[in-house]
Amino acid sequence: MKLSEELIYRGFKAETTIENPEDLDNRQSKKFYWGADPSADSLTIGNLAAIMMCACFVRHGYEPYLLVGGATGQIGDPKENGERDLKSLEEVEHNKKCIREQVETVIRNAVSRLAPSRPSLRGSGAHSAPVVADGLETAYSNHSLTMVDNLEWFSKINYLSFLREIGKNFSMTQLLDRQFVQNRIGEGGSGISYAEFSYTLIQGYDFLHLYREYGVDLQLCGADQYGNCTSGIHMIKRLENADADVWSTPLVIDPVTGRKFGKSEGNAIWLAASDNGSGNYTSVYDFYQFWMNQPDAAVENLLKIYTLLGKEEIEEILKKHAEHPELRLAQKALARGVTAVVHGAGSAETVENLSETLFSKETDFSEFTEDELTEFAAYLPVIAKGTLLVDALVNTGLAESKKKAREFIAQGAISINGTKVQEDLAVNQTAIIKKGKNKFAIVK
């Protein structure tokens, strides 16, 4: 399958300046960049869709550049309904490091089609990158990921020089016509700061700089960034008399809530698997379960976007799934595939086995050994023996508050080693606490 065919098949096409997608197959220059602002110390599955698109380009011989916005991250991408909180310089620096690790790991895993399965993986979080495949395909080894930070050049730019070269050649009319600007400055809007208003100029200059320094003439982005990205095209045309392009991918919409997958929407699924103090993480187990719980109506598109499975493989999985939907074969393939790309093939295999064990009707929770519970503890929240059940539920995240914890207990939604409990008590033995159908914690 050619690049143009794969992009369309997987749904990686929204607005673009490229009239004929087939032009990507024989493009003379094969360098692109994708940017991420360090507004958090972890990316989300919303970002992951764009990264998977980038990996698709790399598999077809394109050279990738990752721009981590140390400069733009200090301002914040303008929102539709209000100004973002400014991050401290220390936060921005920390977030840049974490994002770099995540993007490189995902692209390398996605390009290499993953290494053979490994027994398990511990501590894959914001600082410790997930398993990276041993044997990288030629596409990646020939074009390793080049990481750049726009703070490197913006820290050296004179403000007046920037206004003379860029500000003088940029139309305010284009900015004022942007929908987010209209929403912010219109009646009932929150207004917009000069810093936010300048964001699109800064992002456009990034494209110009990468064109001048590296010959990058293609930018990839999410559909919500398309307007900002075209600013760079205008600058390159005006100042270098050269052509450049933007290719965007649609935002992925949660089929249950109707909202986009992303950290601004309050339903974020993070790529980091352990907390680094910010709370921006999703455990490998919860990450796997998120994909397992996707509805049948959404799973085909998600398999195309988020896994490395080919067209024939996806069609075969969907055929078998239609024959026996109760087995949830499509959801299992989705959960296994995405978890492997983000957290490594070993983690995907381990958490899949863990899930099957926890959900099996034949499992006797009281018979787990200390070693088995230690293995589970790498993927499930852990609480010390002797903790009161109400406190255990709150401290492991199974309940939002003590009031909620008591309600769950009274409703019979809590069990210890498979036995329902209806009163608060100290959990003194090694055990597995279960809430509802799919939430677990370890007591040890």
Stretches found by the model and what they are:
Residues 1-33:
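Positively charged, low-complexity intrinsically disordered leader regions
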Residues 10, 88-89, 95, 108-111, ...:
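Divalent-metal (Mg2+/Mn2+/Ca2+)-assisted nucleotide/phosphate chemistry catalytic cores
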Residues 112-142:
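Intrinsic disorder/low-complexity segments
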Residues 73-95, 102:
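Active-site-proximal loop->helix
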Residues 21-78, 219-223:
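N-terminal catalytic cores of NTP/NDP-binding nucleotidyl/phosphoryl-transfer enzymes
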Residues 235-444:
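Conserved nucleotide- and phosphate/pyrophosphate-binding catalytic cores
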Residues 76-80, 157-163, 257-265:
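Short acidic, glycine/serine/threonine-rich loops at helix termini
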